[in-house]
């Protein structure tokens, strides 16, 4: 089983500085210079990959198939550092579930649950 080394409670954390490329202004549209919700989701997905993919058998990766309960709770300005933590909550065959939180300092700025499936790198 390609997920044999994974278990509930396994986790990863990433820290990322918010840049213009991650902001609501990334496409030249006027608005606040803050982390966009699509970028927050991207960081959450990257963190879940860090919690999983390095521990899979060779030839396997994960792909996302669901995001539930995504809430962007507070704005985060360009230059601020966001810390994202993904914790595996369930491993069911090739399906993996995560609880994810994002923080700026001590303030929670986002939460979600995420689900990924393990597939072979050739797509099977």
Where are these regions (language model features)?
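HotDog/MaoC-like acyl-thioester-processing domains
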Residues: 8, 78, 87-124
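Catalytic strand-loop segment that frames the active site of acyl-thioester-processing enzymes
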Residues: 2-37
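Hydrophobic beta-strand-centered segment that forms part of the acyl-chain substrate-binding groove
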Residues: 49-83
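Generic structural detector for well-ordered beta-strands
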Residues: 15-19, 71, 115-117
